[in-house]
Amino acid sequence: MEEMRLKLKAVDARTIDFTPYGKLFNLRAEGEGLCYSCAADYTGSCTAAPVIDTLGSLGYTKSAGLPFTAEQMERHGHTQEAQMPESQPIVFLVAPATDAPRPNAKDVKAVIIPKGYVAVLDRGVWHSASHGLYTESYYYWLANVYEGEPTEWQPIDGGPITVEE
């Protein structure tokens, strides 16, 4: 018997209420929580406070583009995680933090994070790895990583989930 797969269409994170998952920062435009600097030959922006509330390791991950299928999602009870696209928008699955031992497919959304944005996921928020919107892609992430840290990967109840454009 063929396995049924839930299919989701990715939505721009700017068009939904992202607060159940964390915060979005637009580093390309002025906004709350950001600082700016400029000179004749550059303009720059940064978050006014640390982007995560713990010490963090900076990571760089390569992943496939859309479509992708996720059988599991991860959560971090000990740290927030910031994700930043490199050369193209990124897409990942996200579900609110709960006391449940696994993410439930009915709670999962596929979100697009545009270039120039940072998505900061709260502790306990379920998420997949990020993928390029168009093709194989790289993204940066920032989280508290150490040997034996309690990140957990769990199967998606009602999954797997395939994400399409």
What are these regions (language model features)?
Residues 125:
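Short beta-strand-plus-loop segments that form exposed binding edges in beta-rich domains
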Residues 1-113, 128-165:
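Active-site region of the double-stranded beta-helix
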